[in-house]
C-alpha cells in the first residue's frame, strides 16, 4: 500500500506528556496505550538515511510485521507499506546476514492514538539506545491542516513548536552515529 502522509510533530517533556494525558483522560477520552517495536535498517554507509529515506520492520504482538519505506517529498512523506505474517524466513534472513541492509537500531514506542474530528492525535513515549523521549504527532488530510492543529495544541498546552523537528528514527540514527555503544 502506498500513500502520502501529512504530519506535524513536536517534542515534549515527560511532564508535558503526563499533563496532556491527564487532560485528555479528564476530558473523557479513553486512552489505550499499546507498544510497537520498530527495527530500522541501513547499510554500513547509511545509504538510506543519507538519501532522505527510512526503512523499518514494525513488529506487533499479533505476529504481523509491517515493512515500511518512507521517502521525503516536497510536501509530506511517501509511505510504502507491506504487511508480512510471521514467517521463519524473516528471522533467518536477518540472522544469516543475507541482506546488505542490516538492523541498526531497535526503537520501542508506547503509543496512544486518538481520532478527533478530521485528524489523528498520536502521543508517543520512545525508548532507543540510552534515550527516552516523548512527542505528539498530528496526522491530517493536508500538511496545512496538520500544522494548524499542531499550533492549536501547542498553544493550549504551552508547548514549543519547532519547524525543524527531527522524526524519532532520525534522532535514533543521530544518537547511534555519535558513537553510542
How would you name each of these model-derived features?
Residues 1-181:
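Phosphate-end processing signature that detects enzymes handling 5′-triphosphorylated RNA
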Amino acid at each position: 500500500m502506498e500513500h502520502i502522509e501529512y504530519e506535524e510533530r513536536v517534542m515534549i517533556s515527560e511532564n508535558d506528556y503526563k499533563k496532556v494525558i491527564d487532560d485528555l483522560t479528564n476530558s473523557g477520552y479513553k486512552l489505550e496505550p499499546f507498544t510497537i517495536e520498530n527495527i530500522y535498517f541501513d547499510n554500513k554507509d547509511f545509504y538510506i538515511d543519507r538519501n532522505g529515506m527510512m526503512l523499518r520492520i514494525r513488529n506487533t504482538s499479533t505476529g504481523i510485521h509491517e515493512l515500511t519505506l518512507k521517502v521525503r517529498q516536497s510536501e509530506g512523506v511517501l509511505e510504502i507499506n507491506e504487511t508480512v505474517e510471521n514467517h521463519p524466513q524473516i528471522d533467518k534472513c536477518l540472522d544469516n546476514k543475507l541482506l546488505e541492509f542490516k538492523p541498526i537500531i531497535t526503537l520501542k514506542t508506547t503509543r496512544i492514538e486518538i481520532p478527533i474530528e478530521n485528524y489523528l492525535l498520536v502521543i508517543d513515549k520512545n525508548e532507543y539506545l540510552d534515550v527516552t523521549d516523548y512527542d505528539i504527532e498530528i496526522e491530517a488530510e493536508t500538511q496545512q491542516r496538520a500544522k494548524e492543529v499542531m499550533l492549536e495544541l501547542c498553544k493550549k498546552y504551552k508547548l514549543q513548536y519547532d519547524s525543524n523537528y527531527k522524526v524519532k528514527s532520525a534522532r535514533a540514527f543521530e544518537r547511534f552515529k555519535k558513537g553510542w555503544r
